Amino acid sequence: MSIRVIIAGFKGKMGQAACQMVLTDSDLDLVAVLDPFESESEWQGIPVFKDKADLAGFEADVWVDFTTPAVAYENTRFALENGFAPVVGTTGFTSEEIAELKEFSRAQDLGGLIAPNFALGAVLLMQFATQAAKYFPNVEIIELHHDKKKDAPSGTAIKTAELMAEVRESIQQGAADEEELIAGARGADFDGMRIHSVRLPGLVAHQEVIFGNQGEGLTLRHDSYDRISFMTGVNLGIKEVVKRHELVYGLEHLL
C-alpha cells in the first residue's frame, strides 16, 4: 500500500523538488499540497489547500514541510495532532521546540523527522566533523547558501556545532584578547567555535568545517549543487517515519 503524502510549501523550490520525487515513486502517493498563496484549487489533479486547518481529519500518512521558520513549529505540531508523521526540512527550530515535539510525538505514538539537511553527503560531513573534533578542538565553520535563505546560521551549521560540542574540548577559538574592528567580523560564537554565514546568488547549499593544529590543517567540505541532492534523504525520511514511534532530529538517526 502506498504511503499517502501531504506537502506543505509545495510552491517553493524544495517543495517542487519534493513533489516531483513523490510523483515518480510508485510507493508514494501525493494526496494533497498546501500553500497559503496558491490561487488554484488543484495542481496536477491534486487538491490544493490554503489553510492547514482544512486538512484536519484528512486521510494521509506523512506531512512533508518545506515552508518557513515562522510557521514550521506550528505546522509540525498540527501534523502530529492529526496523525501525520512529519518530515520537516524547514529550519529555525529552537532546542526547546524540538524537545517538546519529541515528547509530543511519543505521546501520539508517531514517528517524525526534523532534518537540518537531507543530503546524505552533508550528514556524513557532520559525522566526520564530530570524529575530527575529538582531536582538533580548534575549528571554525563556514556555511554558504543562496541569498533567499531566511535564517542564519544554517540549521546544518548549528547541528554540526552541536555534535562537535558534545565531544570537543571546550575552548575559545582565537586570541584571548582579539578585537573586532567591525562588529560580527569573527562570526557567531557557539561554545567557543566560530560560525560564518555567506549569502550569495548562484549558491545552493555548501559547508566547510576547518580544523587547525600546530603545523597542520584539515578541511571538510560538502556541496549541494542542485536541490535534487536532498531528495534521497527526503524519500528515506518518508519511508522510515511511518515505521517509527517518535520524532528524531537529524537524518543520521534513520541511517
UniProtKB/Swiss-Prot annotation:
Compartments where found: Cytoplasm
Active site: 145 (proton donor/acceptor), 149 (proton donor)
GO molecular function: 4-hydroxy-tetrahydrodipicolinate reductase; NAD binding; NADP binding; oxidoreductase activity, acting on CH or CH2 groups, NAD or NADP as acceptor
InterPro entries reported for this sequence: DapB_C, DapB_N, DapB_N_CS, DHDPR_bac, NAD(P)-bd_dom_sf
Catalysed conversion reaction: (S)-2,3,4,5-tetrahydrodipicolinate + NAD(+) + H2O = (2S,4S)-4-hydroxy-2,3,4,5-tetrahydrodipicolinate + NADH + H(+); (S)-2,3,4,5-tetrahydrodipicolinate + NADP(+) + H2O = (2S,4S)-4-hydroxy-2,3,4,5-tetrahydrodipicolinate + NADPH + H(+)
Gene3D superfamilies named in the record: Dihydrodipicolinate Reductase, domain 2 (3.30.360.10), NAD(P)-binding Rossmann-like Domain (3.40.50.720)
Stored Pfam families: DapB_C, DapB_N
Functional pathway: Amino-acid biosynthesis; L-lysine biosynthesis via DAP pathway; (S)-tetrahydrodipicolinate from L-aspartate: step 4/4
Keywords: Amino-acid biosynthesis, Cytoplasm, Diaminopimelate biosynthesis, Lysine biosynthesis, NAD, NADP, Oxidoreductase
EC number: 1.17.1.8
Keyword Cytoplasm part of the UniProt annotation: yes
Disulfide bridge map: none
Highest taxon of source: Bacteria
GO cellular component: cytosol
Residue positions binding (S)-2,3,4,5-tetrahydrodipicolinate: 146, 155-156
Biological process, per Gene Ontology: diaminopimelate biosynthetic process; lysine biosynthetic process via diaminopimelate
Residues the record lists as binding NAD(+): 9-14, 35, 89-91, 115-118
Record has Chloroplast as a keyword: no
Function statement: Catalyzes the conversion of 4-hydroxy-tetrahydrodipicolinate (HTPA) to tetrahydrodipicolinate.
Family note: Belongs to the DapB family.
Protein name per UniProt: 4-hydroxy-tetrahydrodipicolinate reductase
